[in-house]
């Protein structure tokens, strides 16, 4: 449910910041333990079609091992964005040619240090905001604090500050 709740918080932050959004979870046919996908649509005008996203602008990967089982880049748009929880050095992160911006953070270690458990969804919210700027950080922090308390809100801010960003093809 961490993925689903993170998607809901992104939408809430967009709406609170004056835009529109919707989140759509997808659980697939597998049983417990299978990867969970959540789609988020953000816009400055109302969003009518409530369907899966087949050509994302951004992909957020909460667990980097998922890349061994699923093509997380499937359909990503030209000039796409990747936000990745990883222990890898930025130079070792491999992305397709369509990705122009990569953000990495070790959300697992940050969460373990701060919370004592590997809850990566809140940390990845901070990384997403740092990389894209599509939603206000203060709105994310406020909603996370409302749901999970001050320690999780501080986790968002810490991950935001520790996120490394790389622009690809000299667009930096």
Where are these predicted regions, by residue range?
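Active-site cofactor/cluster-binding pocket
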Residues: 1-172
């Amino acid at each position: 449910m961490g993925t689903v709740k993170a998607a809901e918080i992104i939408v809430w932050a967009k709406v609170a910041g004056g835009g529109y959004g919707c989140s759509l979870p997808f659980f697939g046919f597998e049983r417990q333990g299978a990867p969970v996908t959540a789609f988020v649509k953000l816009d400055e005008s109302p969003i009518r079609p409530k369907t899966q996203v087949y050509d994302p602008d951004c992909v957020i990967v909460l667990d980097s091992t998922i890349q061994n089982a699923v093509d997380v880049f499937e359909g990503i748009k030209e000039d796409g964005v990747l936000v990745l929880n990883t222990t890898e050095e930025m130079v070792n992160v491999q992305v397709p040619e369509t990705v122009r911006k990569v953000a990495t953070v070790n959300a697992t270690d940050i969460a373990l240090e701060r919370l004592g458990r590997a809850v990566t969804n809140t940390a990845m919210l901070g990384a997403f905001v740092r990389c894209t700027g599509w939603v206000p950080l203060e709105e994310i922090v406020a909603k996370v604090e409302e749901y999970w308390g001050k320690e999780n809100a501080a986790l968002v801010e810490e991950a935001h500050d520790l996120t490394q960003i790389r622009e690809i093809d000299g667009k930096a």
